[in-house]
């Protein structure tokens, strides 16, 4: 077993023992996707530390434990259609693709250099998810509606365009807060009557979601 694979298994076992990874589908995705393929070369040795890592351009790849929390509360299954807001490195989109299928994943990124970085990483790793260049605060109406919208940057609030692009009984998962430096992880479930039920999953810190309906630069 290579050192990277050994480190990956150790981290996944730790995430499982601490309760971050709860389901087989999330565990299998973590085992399948190599985080080292989605980070800059100078960070490769830190691929399986449970910490956020800079990918450049003011952006980060989240800590594996935070990613696991978000994926678990998203309740993903094969065949669900997912929009990811904030492609970043592409790692999270690859994990979602393992759980839902490549053809069911759309991911959107607004920073040109990050868009190219994430797209290159995903294609090199063999994933054919749809990568869109654009403002994630507007969602991506063209391929809507979605069963899940997963937001990987901090939003000042839940944006109406996301609500309008979710299926009945679908879910929006997002870190939300009125301050740039602290958020709560929220899950909004759309009820049959069209209203949303909000469930809080604790505090977190993400880079700001910049866009027309998000934070300003």
What residues fall within each predicted segment?
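Class I SAM-dependent transferase core
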Residues: 1-83, 87, 91-99, 114-125, ...
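Extracellular beta-propeller repeat domains
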Residues: 60, 152, 172-174, 178, ...
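Conserved nucleotide-cofactor-binding alpha/beta core module
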Residues: 75-196
């Amino acid at each position: 077993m290579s050192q990277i694979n050994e480190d990956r298994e150790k981290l996944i076992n730790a995430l499982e023992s601490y309760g971050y990874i709860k389901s087989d589908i999330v565990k299998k995705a973590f085992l399948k996707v190599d985080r080292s393929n989605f980070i800059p070369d100078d960070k490769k040795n830190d691929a399986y530390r449970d910490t956020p890592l800079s990918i450049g351009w003011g952006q980060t790849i989240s800590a594996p434990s935070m990613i696991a929390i978000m994926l678990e509360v998203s309740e993903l299954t094969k065949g669900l259609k997912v929009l990811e807001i904030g492609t970043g490195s592409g790692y999270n989109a690859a994990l979602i693709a393992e759980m839902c299928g490549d053809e069911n994943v759309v991911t959107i990124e607004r920073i040109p250099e990050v868009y190219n970085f994430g797209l290159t990483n995903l294609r090199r790793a063999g994933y054919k998810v749809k990568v869109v260049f654009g403002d994630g605060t507007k969602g991506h109406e063209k391929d809507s509606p979605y069963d899940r919208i997963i937001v990987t940057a901090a939003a000042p609030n839940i944006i109406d365009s996301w609500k309008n692009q979710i299926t009945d009984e679908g879910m929006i998962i997002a870190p939300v807060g009125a301050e740039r430096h602290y958020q709560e992880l929220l899950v909004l479930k759309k009820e049959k009557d069209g209203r949303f039920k909000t469930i809080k999953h604790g505090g977190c810190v993400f880079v700001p979601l910049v866009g027309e309906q998000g934070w300003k630069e």
